[in-house]
Every structure is written in C-alpha cells, then in structure tokens.
C-alpha cells in the first residue's frame, strides 16, 4: 500500500514552503505513518533542532478543524482529508509518499498470508485500471461527514492515489526505516532482520499467491 501524506497549512497562514515551518508548531498523530512522513518532510527542509511538533488527535477531521481554528501552524493529512482541506482553501506546502504496511503475528499461516496477498493484488489491479471509479470509496467510508459527502469523484487528484502490488519487504528499506526512527528516539535497539521479517513465511506465501509450486 502506498500512502500520500500532505503537509497542510490554513488559508490564512503566511507559510508557503516547508522551510518556513522552522520553529513553528506542527501537529502530528504520533505513532502513525502520517506522523513519520511529516517528520521526514520537515527534516528535509530544516535542521533537526528547528523541527517543532506536538501530539494531536488521531482523528483527521478534528485535526483539520483545529488547524482551521489556528491551534497550530500545520498538520499532515491523507486522503480524503487532503481534498477536503483544499476545498476549505488550505495549501499543501509539501507532499510525500510512503509504504503503508501490516503486521502478522506467528499464528498467521503462509496459506492465510497468501490469500491476503492475492486479494490485495487483485484490488490493486482493479483500482489502478479505473482510479476515478474507486475514489468513491473515500466518500462511502464517511457517511456521517457532510464535507466528504459533498465531494464528487472528480474532486480528487488521481496523482495522489498510488497503489503497488504487494511484494517481499526489501531488507535495506526496513533497516533504513528502523535506524532512522531510532535516530529520533522512536525505536530502541539494533535492527535484526531475522527478528523483524519472517522470510520463510513471506517467501512461501508469495510463492503460493503466485501459484508457484513449493
């Protein structure tokens, strides 16, 4: 799964570039991918000591409302909230893409994981073949939010909808992510590929999903 995260400021903000957020408060949903994406975008635009963040609600709608009330200078949103923010006049000062992921415990068999991989692969192919059709799911998923219900599929920027078929986790990417998070105090200990990635189950599952004999 590929996720688009956008660093968003209110319509009245004087900030137009991520560099201008140095020493200004950015609200992040700590513990989620959007928060890490936010730190990455800020880190690339200023010295680490200038990155200023605070914990914010996990509810994207409430976070956007707080941004519009002026409670902080910026936050990071995903779709459909990026589109809602743009409709409200907000500006995107930076965007990035990152891998969403899932965690399987030891009880998940290669067969179950293979079924999951097949289902996700089929979904990715269908959505990539007609993204405009499937962005309507963003609207369907928030039946009680008037702003989202007012959106039409044509309102979405399809360039922000990116999907990739699932595959084995590249060790160098997993190592980099771990070490980067550790450098921010978000992880402790050294990266251990054998402890973090069950290659035996992963390999068997992907072979089963692809119909390759074991």
Feature annotation, model-predicted:
Residues 1-57, 73-76, 94-96:
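Short, glycine-/small- and polar/acidic-enriched structural segments
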Residues 41, 84, 180-181:
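Residues within well-ordered alpha helices
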Residues 47, 90-91, 186:
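Short aromatic/hydrophobic-glycine micro-motifs
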Residues 59-142:
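Pocket-lining segment of extracytoplasmic ligand-binding domains
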Residues 110-188:
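Secondary-structure end/capping motifs
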Residues 182-214:
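Conserved C-terminal helix/tail region of periplasmic/extracytoplasmic solute-binding proteins
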